[in-house]
Amino acid sequence: MKAGCSIVEKPEGGGGYQFPDWAYKTESSPGSRQIQLWHFILELLQKEEFRHVIAWQQGEYGEFVIKDPDEVARLWGRRKCKPQMNYDKLSRALRYYYNKRILHKTKGKRFTYKFNFNKLVMPNYPFINIRSSGVVPQSAPPVPTASSRFHFPPLDTHSPTNDVQPGRFSASSLTASGQESSNGTDRKTELSELEDGSAADWRRGVDPMSSRNAIGGGGIGHQKRKPDIMLPLFARPGMYPDAHSPFAVSPLPGRGGVLNVPISPALSLTPTIFSYSPSPGLSPFTSSSCFSFNPEEMKHYLHSQACSVFNYHLSPRTFPRYPGLMVPPLQCQMHPEESTQFSIKLQPPPVGRKNRERVESSEESAPVTTPTMASIPPRIKVEPASEKDPESLRQSAREKEEHTQEEGTVPSRTIEEEKGTIFARPAAPPIWPSVPISTPSEEPLEVTEDIEDRPGKEPSAPEKKEDALMPPKLRLKRRWNDDPEARELSKSGKFLWNGSGPQGLATAAADA
C-alpha cells in the first residue's frame, strides 16, 4: 500500500458488498480503476460506522442521503489518493452516473440520490455477493413495499413464463433483500421453500391487485432464476394507482406472452390497458402466439390509446405496431348547434378602377362577338337637341333616376324606350355598367352624357373606349372643354340645377 492512500478495509466474510479483487489493487496508480465511486458509496452504506455520514433513506428502496457531503468527499479523496477532493468534484462524478443510468438525483431532496437497481446487474463482476451474513445491518436498504417503484426501463426477460405483472418483485429480488444467508447451498434450499408457496403468500399479502395476475402463484417455480451475481432488481416499473395519473388501473388481466415494457418514462400518463409490447423483431420470443389478442380487448385498448393521444397531446408514434389492426375512429360527439353548417354568402368587394376597366373591356368585347349586335350601325339622331324644351329633359332625367334607384344597375332598354323621341332605334348596352351611379360625383355624368349626345357630333368607338377607361373627373373635364353648347347650358343653370342639383354645379365649378 502506498503512503497517504489509506483505503477502507476490504470486507471479510460476507459482511457487505464484496467487490472484485481488481478494485482493491493497491499497486495500481492513484486515480486509476482502484474502485469506482458508486462501488465506494455502496461500501460506505454497508458500514455501521458511516451511518452519520451516509445512510439509506427509509421508505424508498435504493435511495440514500449524504448527511455530511464534506466527509464523504474526504473519504473518497483518501481512497483515490486525492487530498484536494471536495463535494463539487464528487457531485460532478455522480452526475456522470446519471447518463449511465446507474443512479439519479431525487428531485426536491437535497443530497439525496437513488440507485437504479434494474441497471446494476453486474455480469462483469462475478465475485459480488449482495447479501450480508446473519444479522441485517441497520443501514441495509429498506425492504421494498408495494408503493415503491422505479421509472427506469427494466431488464430484458429471458423466459416467456417470467412474471409479466408490473410493480412486483421477482423471486430473485426477494431473496436479495438481505434476509437470507450468503452461501450457495442455503440459497438452493431457500429456493425450494419459495417454490412451495412462501412467495405466493407474500405476493397475496403485499399486492393489492393480485386479481390481475395472469400466471398465478404456482408459475413462480418455473421462472428462470437470475444468477447470484446481481443486485436486487425489479421485474419492471410499477403499475400501481398513481395519484397524478388521469387513468385508473385497468381491470383487464395482463397477457402472459406479452412484455409489459414502457416506451419512455415520460409516457406515464398513457393508459395501460395493455402495457406497451415491443415489436416481434425486438422481442425475445418471436412466435406469433405472443400476439393472440382478444378483438374486443384490442378495440378497447386502441380506442383508449387514441383518446390518450388526442386528449393529452402525445405523439401517435407511441402506438405499438400491429399490422392487421386498424385504430377505431375517435367518437367525438359534436353539439347540435356546432354541427349545423351555416351557409355564409360573401358579397364581392366593390369594383376598383382596374377591375372596372377589365369588366368594361370584357363586356365591350362580348357584344362584338354576337352577330346581332355586330351588325347594328352607329346611333342616328333624329332631331337636334336645340329643338327640345327643358321640360322634356327634366322629365327624362327624373325617370332615369327613379329606375336607377329601383334596379341598382344602369338600365339600357327602358331608358332608350323612354328616349324614343331622341333615337331612332334601341341603344346598345352602355359601356359603363359597373360604375355606381348613386354617388354624388357620378350623378352629373348622366347629364353630361345626355348633353354630349345632343349635339350633332357623335363620338366614334375608339373615343367611347377611351372615355370608358378615363377617370370620371378627367372625362367630365374633357367634355366640358370640348363642348361649348354644354358649357352654355351649365352656365345658364337650367340643366345642372334641374337634372342633378347643386352637386353637379359644384363639381363643374371645381373642374373649371
UniProtKB/Swiss-Prot annotation:
Location of Phosphoserine modifications: 139, 159, 315
Highest taxon above the source species: Eukaryota
Region of interest (Disordered), residue spans: 136-222, 336-512
A GO CC annotation given for this chain: nucleus
Residue positions, PTM N6-acetyllysine: 388
Record key words, sorted: Acetylation, DNA-binding, Isopeptide bond, Nucleus, Phosphoprotein, Repressor, Transcription, Transcription regulation, Ubl conjugation
Acidic residues compositional bias, start-end: 443-452
Bias kind Polar residues: ranges: 158-184
PROSITE patterns: ETS_DOMAIN_1 (PS00345), ETS_DOMAIN_2 (PS00346), ETS_DOMAIN_3 (PS50061)
Biased composition (Basic and acidic residues): 380-406, 453-468, 479-491
SMART domains in UniProt: ETS (SM00413)
GO molecular function, one term: DNA-binding transcription factor activity, RNA polymerase II-specific
Principal subcellular localisation of the protein: nucleus
Xref: PANTHER family: ETS (PTHR11849), ETS TRANSLOCATION VARIANT 3 (PTHR11849:SF30)
Family: Belongs to the ETS family.
Record protein name field: ETS translocation variant 3
